[in-house]
Amino acid sequence: MDNEITSTQNPRIKAACLLRQGRGRQQQQRFLVDGEREIQRALTAGWPLEEVFVCESLLDRPESRQLYDQLVETGIPLCTVTSQVMEKISFGDRSEGLLAVARLRLLPDLDQLTPAPGMLVAVVESVEKPGNLGAILRSADAAGVDAVILANQRTDPFNPNAIRASTGIVFSMPLFAAPSEQVLAWLTGNGFKVCATRIDGSSSYLETDWTGLVAIILGEEAAGLSSCWSGAGVTTVSIPMRGQADSLNVSTTAAILFYEALRQRLL
């Protein structure tokens, strides 16, 4: 283990701080993994970790020490820092004493996604808020969604907020990225039933058959889905609402539809 870093002006610390921003992640081709649960899930998924910053005074739980010992066994470079330095590089107001730097991977194209009988995929188009994307990934994992496709991608899934909102599921959920038109062509070409969520959808989600090969299309609540999802071969689906609100948060919509699909598949 390296000598303890005590200054927030240390070059390694300054480089780590830049990873909070998308530009820094792209320039360095790295990103931060903040939190014990998130680091553990990255390890379990076999994600390449370049180094881990450690503040031993914050490792005050048995689970923290256990993860620390596991990191030591893997041979990943460890760097001790003071609590002040850890606070500087940690995301938000939570610091658990461990923060990893991971290697960025490009999201694969759709030609690397192989359809299978009964596959359920989610297509997330142009969602801007990292927290929403992370929450969608978390719900998708819980409900048994097989893959998530980012269409017309506008959000970095390795943004610290997305990672935290996903509780580290971003490391294990199969993720793909492609333009919306290409996604639609791939789905229809492979026999998927394409269900696009719209306020004025032609059928209620409760009246929709979610079994078989199904793709759930989700868009940013402000702008909605692009026009390519309103043509032939696309079923539009709505969620009934009885109050004054005219839309739901996209992650809430996702959870409702994912679990209706799961319910039908368990019958």
Which residues fall in each region the model found?
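N-terminal positively charged helical leader segments and presequences
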Residues: 1-93, 193
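Glycine/charged-rich beta-loop-alpha catalytic/anionic-binding loops adjacent to active sites
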Residues: 22, 113-122, 232-241
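RNA substrate-binding interface of SAM-dependent RNA methyltransferases
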Residues: 44, 70-73, 79, 84, ...
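Acidic/glycine-rich phosphate/pyrophosphate-binding loops and surrounding catalytic core
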Residues: 93-118
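Structured adenosyl-cofactor binding patch, chiefly the S-adenosyl-L-methionine
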Residues: 100, 139-143, 154-157, 161-169, ...
